[in-house]
Amino acid sequence: LLKHTEKESVDELIKADISELLKLGWTDPEYFKSKAADNKTDVYCAIFKPSHFDENKKYPILDYIYPGPQSLGLRDHSFGQDNGQVLSMVELGFVIVIIEGRGTSERSKSYHDYSYGQLEDNGSIEDHIQVIKNLSETRKYMNISKVGMYGHSGGGYSTANALLKY
């Protein structure tokens, strides 16, 4: 939609048509907020489900982590260039969660500084554990006994840290 600086609509340039995606079973991720491990701080999250999703089945969980520190892992993953891996994994039968734990950017300075000087806490693995436990209580399709984690760059570091620490 093209607009003047006064926000008056001028012309529609193009309109996205996702009808073919919807026919294939694609659904938008579920965005929500949950409490961090401190039980008071809100963290932002998303759940991605396979196109063949069946609420009566149990799905293994993959936690995609990218703690930054300069950017977020959770953006508009619906059609972003980085979401290919997320969409591929859900179609293999996983439920993917993305959790912006304390220490990630683009919130308050104190939120971002949570892991300052303590890189091992970047992205707060404790927040990821808390959110996944909370989710498994309300979303019975999530198999809490089968949880994996993966990420790139800082997310790879956080994944290795989680494997060694937990």
Enumerate the predicted regions with their spans.
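Serine-hydrolase catalytic core recognition
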Residues: 1-166
